[in-house]
Amino acid sequence: MTNPLIDQGSLLNWPAIKTEHITPALDELLAKASDAVAKVTAPETPATWSDVVDPLEQALEKLSRAWSAVGHLSGVMDSEALREAYNANLPRMTQFYIELSQNEALFAKYKAIESSEGFAALSEGCQRIIKREIRDFRLSGAELAPEPKARLKALGQQDAAESHKFSENLLDATNAFTLDVDNVSELDGIPADVIDMYAAEAKAAGLEGKWRISLHMPSYLPAMQYANSASLREKLHRAYSTRASEFGPAERDNTPLIRSLLRNRREEALLLGFKNYAEVSLVPKMADSPAAVEAFLTELAQKARAKGLADWEEVKAFAKEKLNLDEVHPWDVAWVSESLRRAKYAYSDHEVKRYFTLPAVFNGMFRLVEKLFDVRINEDSAPVWHDDVKLWRISDASGNLIARFYTDLYARASKRGGAWMDSDTTYCVLPDGSVRTPVAFLVCNFSHPVGDKPALLTHDDVTTLFHEFGHGLHHMLSRVPQAQLSGINGVEWDAVEMPSQFMENWAWNYDTLKTLSSHVDTGEVLPKDLFDKMLAAKNFQSGMFCLRQLEFALFDLRIHDDDKSDHAEDFEKVLDNVRKEVAVVPAAEYSRFAQSFAHIFAGGYSAGYYSYKWAEVLSADAFSAFEEEGLFNPATGKRWVDEVLSRGSSRDAIENFRAFRGRDPSIEPLLRHSGIL
């Protein structure tokens, strides 16, 4: 019997992958990878690119792809059997990669390549890989004595297990709560199509004649924005804000995991000779130091504060004068804000949503990308992991295949929350001269279609789709011959969001929105007067939103950037202090935000959440080139592909930016686009 995790092909046979395949596949692929490591590190193996780096990359690629596929399925098709198989193999996979990163013999081979006469003859990309690998060996503790190296390895294994458990707890806590409503009058104010969705959810659970609200965003958010019942909103807000905390079952409480992760990260930093974990985190990033990040964030906070305070005062005044609310409670904020926005700009998110059917949005987004970047996008076919999933192909103007990508767009209980792009395979030129075609995943959590109507997207959903497709284009349009530098591989973490945030700008262009809007009942495109209202409201509460993001970023930085404390016992106090300094909207006393902050405790953004704002500066300034030269100027689009999207990490991100823009980045376009200037 063949094993689809071993017999991989250009596209994986997703429905053929069973949990019983996972361990045997990893047994075989780990053994082959270990053999390859032993061969390239043997004393008689010459320290050359072709004898060490190429064969090792080829051996590791199959293992990495198989394990990534298991991780992908864990994120989109969670089940008890899959979870058991993933968790059973996580320790040995973590051990393999940690031991590889600390392998003294392999480290010595890379150093020998760098110091050899042949090094100068290598391409610039190959030289860059060697230098980066040497840096990463040092960051992994390859130069440490045996005892601290073993300790660092143990900490790394524990971190991997605890990060995954954090994510599992959050998903389980999100799924554990539902609010079943007996009387439709309790849903007063909520749009009819959302109420229909609640009825469908209840019916699917065997509760005919009732309505079920969950904590998944397509269900939770409309209730918080539109429900006139304060008691309904309070119940939902309390449940959402206390997920995976001490307010629920102990086995789903993420507090002990946060404490352990913070302790371990500080210990890892000290073992490596750094003062704190933030210093370690920033070594491969654009930002020079934690102090530089702190200065960047506090400067932005100062510039946004006046607008944020004005936004909050407007909310409170409207609540008192129009809604008879003397106090705006945490569960009132979204409802009052949406009511204020409707009153101020005379439109609702629900009204806009009727114009954005998923098929029309996809078609319009693809046509835009085709025009900007001279490619063609068409639906493809191949076995997929769920009926909701589709496969697409990107070709050049002559029809030659460039890349493929899967889309998995609807929320379901087996899928973790949020939206993301991930990669299956990365573009590269193989040793035999053939090309590996990149394959990407585009995953979202949109509302399902109801009845015979297509799925409807909010404008925020449209923006999210553009964002994730921006990541996908960065991965798929890469033309770097070395896989280690191709796509998003090796791109500085604080620059990797630049192409995604860059694409969001077209979701605010009327000519673009005309091509991707089609009213669900009439087929009419988005009217110009409605768009004008949306545009006028674009920076509605932008000060509040900016300060909220800066609150998250400063909290993340400060729990990791302290020479004297790991903040394991007082991380909530750190958050409270950041809120006192930055926030304008009071948090609920019961809020346990950190326990659901998966970005930094399970998503790779530890001491790196600032990256979103850092990359916004780059993306806003990059988009201003299109504002200056024409939004649909193919020459500007080609320059963006040539100097940024196709480059991967073959150059530093700042060099890519300078090559595209002709100068260093400016913060002014971001402040202007945000309405803060």
Model-derived segments and spans:
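Short, glycine-/Ser/Thr-/acidic-enriched flexible segments
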Residues: 218-220, 268, 397-399, 409-413, ...
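Short His/Asp/Glu-rich catalytic/ion-coordination signatures at enzyme active sites or charged loops
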Residues: 6-21, 70-89, 112-154, 214-256, ...
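C-terminal, non-catalytic "cap/extension" segments appended to globular domains
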Residues: 1-21, 28, 189, 197, ...
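Short, hydrophobic/amphipathic alpha-helical patches that form generic packing surfaces
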Residues: 62-72, 131, 135, 238, ...
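N-terminal helix-rich structural modules
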Residues: 1-191, 626
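A non-catalytic, amphipathic alpha-helix used as a structural packing/dimerization or gating element
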Residues: 24-28, 32, 154, 158, ...
